């Protein structure tokens, strides 16, 4: 029984001493008594290499490098005693989840938390923490009973104790956790003859848990000799840099006292690691209160970067430079970080420099395609075949790889399913996946070509293949009722999918292609899946459970799976966190992300038990728990100290001034402390360095091209750029080894999202030799020529979705009102409420099933929406009844179509216009309602357009003038061209151009205004027609029969003053002005169509009233217009003009007679 402690500051040769000591014993007696070197898990590989790489050793059977858990198994192999099944972390969490589900009603505080998957993990961590510090459920219960705790704390501890106790009851005698096996190891240590002959060395730890101290005490008691290495100078002060390892030393001394033996301490004072004085000075004075600054020899550096990406790019360049100029191998370099976002950055950036690396971090398997496939499959069953999980299942491409162009087929399937709203068992109903159904997909209604038919057949085959697998999986799962049956069913389903052989084939292919990391991932995923199934069987065996419970437990297990990647090569940069990474004696260590808030880190408690509760527990029970946040905060300087003393020759600190999300960051206060140690240690700004020495950016061809691009871009923007970059461009352009992709990259220098004017032949090929178009198409061109080009030239369309869009709603109202209008022949004024309701019901039952493949009957929400549509229609008809009772105009036509060649007498003729190039312009469309009024030989016509949006239902004469609103003038022109077809006299004149807002009014009144008359008034006013009226006195009273002096109409935008004159707020114009607006509108058509055929496709949106069409445009991702830098492209409207005055310059010639 012997206990030794090797203590000393970092780099004083403690670890070297024990390794040399072990090597010497191995040389002297290779078959002697056992030697065990205990180290943290992440350090065992490095220490094994120290022995394997020593050429003076010819092999030995006596030395093993183990961590505590592996040591316990080594003893169990000798003495037995561990009969129970080992329970993994995932298995324990599943058991905890099952316990809290069963005992939910008994929980005091956490009753509402049990449904959250992450809660079982929190409980696991807390219980594991208790076990590490030897706190049993009984001790917890005693503590709760004997102390007057706050209600919340009491209930919290009662809940944890309840789960902990049930967990122990389940585990006891059948299973064993890691902590339990270590406890058993302590109990059985005295039976091991192998251990009694062993010499134990413990290195790489700074502190231990209570359980580990108990193991150390037993090792000292039963082993021949125990030697512990601690990095400390022996200072026991609470605020000492070495507080943590000094506290461990105190515990080791207590162990010696407990066993009544002497602790042999050996202090190491001579610094051996550092080969440069400035590194020695850094280690010796980092925590010194008094020191003498010295000049740095360039082996301690501090780099300042504008952002994190620039920081890692610079580190990568420096590593390549060291490798090339100093012959330094990658394995002699390490990068330590603390902010997790740096890990993702390095995984992204280092491969661009072809730098081999190994990052010592476990990553979740959750987002791997194989895992996503499994979890999506589970969610499909849980949600009853909902769209989202099913499409995720398809898109993983795991089950569909055997199909050629599977991703393309899946895209088509997604478009089709989105459009048709396929859900649930409709996925396996052939009538929804008939080839003819695909013919109707999107905007296409033409017969299918043979190629399209063959593609759609392959889509259906792919869908059917996957659905058979889903049904097989569901069937097997549905037939199970116990855990073992569920696990068996799951495995059999995977076998039926041929998944194991497919994955092994994929793995072998990746290995052959040199992608060993991806190949290893597939192995780990499959082994992980099998492990979770094993855990489920181990924990629950033949226990009865529901399908839902099994899938929940299985998903919890999958959440715990992580990749543990072993190094793929020996010569690679080591990357790890400052807290855990074990990198010793490297030639160069980079400490990246040395920012305030990271180093030192702001430590916050994340466990279920707060720091205050921990402290009170420790005070009252004298039981030590894991360190609180304030204790951990005190050890932050020690974290920095350990990280920066890992290098023998060079240490570089770096920090960024801006975080990943654009937040401002400050350098670590430790850096200022380090700067004070030297007389000449200056912060090196990376950007300034590169400006002064551009060659420092040229370490790798790929990255040099990017830097070249940025420099040439600055040069084109008239910034000062070093001539070096122009020389670099010439060299790279003329070197076939370096110019790959250079032309493509440099083309972005002069990229401008300017479109090219189409030549006449191309315009004709796109648009045809005749323009057949609706009014809205011309309005769209006026809003932005490129939008017109994208939608009508390139014919780009968003995929149709199975949901009610605004335009669908407008179409429904139009069709319903047409149906009812024709039924009553426009006689709204004589309808009573009963008739209105009956007509509405009849119209909806006729029309709604035809909307979006019966969308409005698909869900409860849409059925409710159907009722709301009915209510709006009834409200609208009530308003139309009121308006019809107070006007002399009578409805004559509803939904009157017009085109160049009318199909029959019911359609109107649209006389073709002609572009400047002589190309015919055939306008087509549909007028919602035409009202007429006859007075002697004169006829007046009202155009009524139904709008479901108040915004679009306003006639803006400025927009009319600029061609942004062409509809109403076009409709009036068409009607005036078709007098005979409409049965009107030759003296037919324009009456009103009016919009009717179809809606359900929301009337807001104060309590003192709440009366039936006031409500009715507000109701009628909300339906008031908007637009423009003919100001001729012969027609004014026809608009509203109640019109008289001092009267404001509540059905049209018209009012009279006391003297009978028209009020200024009335929306009126004289007859000649209306004709001039119509003619100007025609000119807009000709101008617009001419520009279209001239090939104008400019990205030139028209800005009006501080609004851009871009705000509502679907093509922004195509034109790349940027509101910040493309404002010069906007066309603007002169909003100061009076359109009615500006229009007076139009020469009507013979029109309007």
Curated annotation (Swiss-Prot):
Its cofactor is Mg(2+); [4Fe-4S] cluster. Residues 269-583 form the UvrD-like helicase C-terminal domain. [4Fe-4S] cluster binds at residues 784, 1110, 1113, 1119. It is an enzyme of class 3 (hydrolase). It comes from the Bacteria. Despite having conserved helicase domains, this subunit does not have helicase activity. This is ATP-dependent helicase/deoxyribonuclease subunit B.
